[in-house]
A protein has these predicted regions:
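Small/flexible residues
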Residues: 4-5, 12, 40, 574-575, ...
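Exposed, low-structure sequence patches enriched in small/polar residues
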Residues: 173-175, 284-347, 351-712
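A generic structural signal for short coil/turn motifs at secondary-structure boundaries
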Residues: 18, 187, 219-223, 462-464, ...
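Bacterial Sec-dependent N-terminal signal peptides
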Residues: 1-35, 675, 699-712
Length: 712
């Protein structure tokens, strides 16, 4: 009897073991499974081991098969957001759309490309109009790349540094991911420092969390140029087969001492100081400072309802007709405190006498002192609470001719706080509340691999910003010639938008206005042609702005009647001859009214370097130089009390090649760089190294950086 039971038990056990492979891979046929196992992949739907492939990792031999024990196979990533090529990546990140149930895949920052560019505002296009030191305000040189904040426009100048609801990254990693970065430069007394930490971990293939923290700042080469920026982002995501959720908390803290720029260009061009801190600044004795605080939280959820039965062979519902319903909640608050004390500065070359000799002149930086004639402490606050409900229809499949039809409604609750004349003495804030209601929608699709198209709109039918409208469309055509992809893209966007609250209402010690403004209309056309395999990109943009709102020559809010047109042509071509890289980015811009939209005629970023293996698959180096340049024009000025750029008409800047010499390397997972910034100071150029009027860029200094990634 005992022998019979033993035989039956063994037969049942063998049958169970024989059935295990079929249970583990219900979606794979035998041929696919054998090919995957031959390539050392335990589960091809979950991707490769990050240590087995790629330049970034060690090429370790696969582990020998364990015939004694079968490994438990994890459920693969089944989200409709990601296609097979994305799932196969070892690590990837994405951002989520605030309005639509869509994600955008972004590259991980683990390569040598652009690693040497330590200022974040220099990483795109031809660069930015910047005050100089790390952590201070900047604005893209390319007019079409400049952000326009509808809410709390005072933080717009720090867009390159801050986390916001549009750029929060979410990660999917096969192994726990940790990356640490540290960069420093200059003497201890004037040091610039950057520290970055990224931690990402997946609890399951579909569920993960990540933390990003950045601390950037400088003690300042020039007097009163200390900055301190802290940016924290904590995010959680679950991208399941039907249900997905993205949630994140953001904290941005910015402190910037304000020096007002040099008393005169002569202090940089014609005078040599023993230390940069000796250069006379216009607000050096005013103790001026800006402090920004931002707290934000959002959660976006969606649930997919397939319209056809889901079988075991359906890896995701991306290829099935489906309807998705979702909701987005946002909380976002910003505050700004500007403080200073009344003081004057002396320009030793302010004027000339009848004999042509310089005569010192005394000036006051601010013309008006409305509240307190001795000191300022301007405090403003803005909060927005937003709810969106959306529906997304997927008629056939997510990448079909009509991929998705989207529609939604949103409700925004705005609160604005600032002092008023009748409440300033009591210390009470005056609060203004507004409610905005809007509807929006879009449609997009794909015709095989050759055509991508889409259109969208947003309309405010009532409430705050009533009548605002945004309409856009895009079309991308793809083809291959001898195996090389060619991409032609066209975009159109028309926006009719109300002025922001602060454009019409501001009460502070130096600026007061309560002026209703008309809606601004901005129409743009864009065409781009790209050949990725040959590192070639050319494009043209045309814009027409009617009733443009801007800060005029006196830094007061201004609205230009009529239309202003702006045309730009952009070209990028990277040449490679063996290990020699010759990278070029050139931008040409024409404005019909330079007093309203001032832009340089030509701007360029050139990078020439040689890249080679020191030790094959172990250590790779780049040695070269970067140069930024723009033609002479009336560059924007910067006003500390507003934290905004304005269209000054007194000083022209440009015609200066700002050049850096660098050596970067990657040793396995560690990246390093050595750089001498502004190596041409005093050697070539006209000596006018200004990007913003009266704000000199940093003088020459040595930098060193280290970034180390851990994937286990």
């Amino acid at each position: 009897m005992r022998k019979t039971s033993t035989i039956i038990f063994r037969l049942l056990l063998w049958g169970l073991l024989a059935a295990l492979p079929q249970v583990a891979f219900p979606q794979l046929d035998a041929k696919t499974l054998m090919q995957a196992q031959r390539n050392g992949i335990n589960n091809p739907l979950y991707g490769n081991n990050p240590y087995e492939n790629g330049e970034d990792e060690e090429n370790l031999p696969p582990n020998p098969a364990d015939t004694a024990k079968e490994k438990r196979i994890r459920k693969p990533l089944e989200s409709y957001f990601f296609n097979d090529s994305i799932r196969a990546l070892n690590n990837f990140l994405w951002t989520i759309s605030r309005d639509y149930n869509r994600v955008k895949i972004e590259p991980l920052d683990t390569t040598l490309q652009d690693w040497r560019i330590d200022y974040p505002f220099y990483r795109k296009g031809v660069g930015d109009i910047a005050l100089g030191p790390l952590g201070q305000a900047s604005m893209p040189t390319d007019y079409f790349e400049r952000p326009r904040y509808e809410n709390f426009s005072f933080s717009q100048a720090y867009d390159a540094y801050t986390y916001n609801l549009e750029n929060v990254p979410f990660y999917n990693v096969k192994k726990p991911y940790l990356q640490m970065t540290y960069l420093e430069s200059g003497q201890k007394k004037f040091r610039e420092e950057q520290f970055g930490l990224t931690v990402a971990h997946n609890i399951s293939p579909s569920t993960g969390f990540n933390i990003n923290y950045k601390a950037r700042g400088t003690r300042g080469q020039y007097d009163r140029s200390r900055t301190k920026n802290h940016n924290l982002e904590v995010a959680f995501s679950h991208t399941g087969k039907r249900y997905s959720i993205h949630a994140a908390y953001i904290n941005n803290h910015i402190e910037q001492e304000e020096n007002g720029g040099v008393v005169g260009e002569w202090a940089i061009v014609d005078t040599t100081f023993e230390m940069p801190s000796g250069v006379p600044m216009r607000l050096a004795s005013a103790e001026a400072e800006n402090i920004f605080r931002n707290n934000a939280f959002f959660v976006e959820q969606s649930y997919g309802i397939p319209l056809l039965p889901v079988t075991e062979s359906d890896f995701s519902i991306a290829h099935l007709p489906a309807v998705y319903i979702g909701h987005t909640f946002e909380y976002n608050s910003w505050s700004k405190i500007y403080s200073d004390i009344r003081s004057t500065y002396v320009d030793d070359r302010g004027s000339r006498d009848e004999n042509g000799n310089f005569v010192p002149t005394e000036h006051s930086f601010y013309k008006n002192w409305y509240i307190n004639p001795l000191q300022s402490r301007d405090s403003i606050y803005e909060r927005i609470i937003s709810n969106r409900f959306f529906v997304q229809a997927q008629p056939w499949n997510r990448n079909g001719v009509v991929g998705t039809l989207n529609g939604g409604v949103g409700l925004d609750l705005h609160t604005y706080s600032q002092f008023a004349m009748d409440t300033y003495l009591t210390g009470e804030y005056r609060k203004t509340k507004k409610t905005g209601f809007y509807v929006y929608g879009s449609i997009d699709g794909k015709i095989r691999r050759y055509v991508d198209w889409g259109a969208d709109f947003r309309l405010y039918p009532s409430g705050y910003r009533s009548g605002d409208l945004s309409v856009g469309a895009n079309l991308a055509l793809s083809a291959k010639v001898k195996g090389h992809p060619l991409i032609l893209e066209g975009r159109f966007r028309m926006e009719r938008r109300s002025p922001s609250f602060w454009d019409e209402n501001l009460f502070s010690n130096h600026f007061v206005w309560f002026t209703p403004l008309s809606k601004e209309t901005d129409t743009r056309f864009e065409v781009t042609f790209r050949v990725p395999d040959y590192a070639l990109e050319v494009g043209a943009k045309q814009g027409v702005v009617t009733d443009k709102i801007y800060y005029g020559a006196d830094a007061l809010i201004t609205q230009a009647p009529g239309a202003v047109s702006l045309t730009s042509v952009y070209a990028r071509k990277d040449f490679r001859i063996g290990g020699l890289h010759l990278d070029h980015r050139v931008l040409l811009q024409w404005s019909s009214d330079q007093e309203v939209i001032p832009v340089p005629l030509a701007s360029a970023f050139l990078s020439y370097y040689y890249e080679f293996w020191v030790v094959r698959n172990v250590l790779r180096l780049q040695i070269g130089a970067d140069c930024r340049y723009n033609t002479n024009y009336y560059s924007p000025g910067y006003n500390p009390a507003l934290s905004a750029f304005y269209n000054q008409r007194e000083v022209r800047t440009g015609n200066y090649p700002y050049t850096d010499l660098f050596v970067t390397g990657k040793w396995k997972r560690m990246r390093i760089f050595l750089k001498y910034q502004h190596i041409n100071k005093g050697l070539w150029g006209n000596g006018e190294y200004f990007s913003t009027a009266r704000y000199p860029l940093n003088p020459g200094m040595f930098k060193i950086g280290l970034s180390w990634g851990f994937y286990d």
